[in-house]
Each structure stands twice: as C-alpha cells, then as structure tokens.
Amino acid sequence: MNPLEKDIAESKPQLAPHEHARAPVTALAVDYRDGEHVPRHRHRRAQLLYAIEGVMTVQAEAGIWVAPPTRGIWLPAGMAHSIRMHGQPRVRTVFVAPRAAGHLPDRCCVLAVGPLLRELIVAATRVPPDWRPGGRDARLMALLLDEIRLEPALPLHLPQPDEPRVARVCRGILREP
C-alpha cells in the first residue's frame, strides 16, 4: 500500500466492524459537513457510496465521479480513492465482500439509485454488521445485491489524462479550483 493511502479501518474506527465482518454485505450511515474531505484510502471490500442528501465527488487514479442524491458511486475492492463532500451529505455506504461481489461492476462507476434500491440501502444501515445467514437480514442483503446488479452505470465520469504534463496541470486545478 502506498504510504499516502490509509487503511481506512485504522483511521475511522466505526468502519472496522464493516471491513472485518464475516457477513458478506454490511452497511453504514455517516453524515458529513459541507467541504469535508476524506483523504485517499482504500477498502478491503467493494463499496457503494450513496448520499441521500448532498453531493459526493470521488477521485481515483482513473478519474473523477460525481453523485447527486439519485446516484451512487460503485468502487471495487482495493481501489484507492478520496472523497469530497458538497452540501451536507448524509452518506449511506454498502460494503460488499469480494466473495459476494460477483456480477457487480469491476470498475468504478456511477449507478442509478431507484426508489427500491434507496430504501434497501437505508434499511441495510439498520442491520448490524454481524448478522447471521438464514433470516430477514440475509434476505434483505441478498435483495440489495440483486438491485445493485440491475442498476445501469451512468456517464458521470471525468477521465484523467494519460499525458504526464497535462495530468499534472489537471491535478493542480483540482487541488485549487
């Protein structure tokens, strides 16, 4: 891991139960302030970031993704990224273990979040990260995965240039718009 990238579970203790859970899918609710920045980090699990209010901008090596409240940002496991908050985002995050992420996107993308998926995400944040197979929680999480699989990827992505000089200029603009 690049020393500039943090193990997010170490720097944000509320994430540790989700990063290390036995359950294949967990969810977490976190509210942020306008302008708050989550520094570059990565997760062991894939992640669907969804703001029920506010807007998020995710920056990764391959580009920048923007998600208003009717959109979510899918990040594959291990993808280094940072997040900038706009407004006062009420973020709901779904974490998916690699073993459960089959048939889910293998690249970062913005997904549509319809009414059913939205309510499933919100309900999933009320399920403890140590839920057991076979009950209501398992059925809810299975349906949540099914709905994520069905949502289309949307073109809300700004690719980063490959040419080093242009990339350096773009990074400067992003740091100080």
Segments (PLM) and residue ranges:
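Generic protein-terminus/edge-of-domain signal
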Residues: 1-55
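Short acidic-glycine-tyrosine-enriched beta hairpin
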Residues: 32, 62-77
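Short histidine-centered beta-strand/loop micro-motifs
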Residues: 36-43, 83-86, 103-106, 133
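A short beta-strand-loop-beta hairpin characteristic of the jelly-roll/cupin
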Residues: 49-68
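Ligand-binding loop in jelly-roll beta-barrel domains
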Residues: 64, 78-108
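Aromatic/histidine-rich interaction motifs
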Residues: 105-118, 123
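Basic, amphipathic alpha-helical hairpins
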Residues: 124-132, 146-155, 161, 169-177
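All-alpha amphipathic helical-bundle segments outside canonical DNA-binding/catalytic cores
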Residues: 133-140, 160
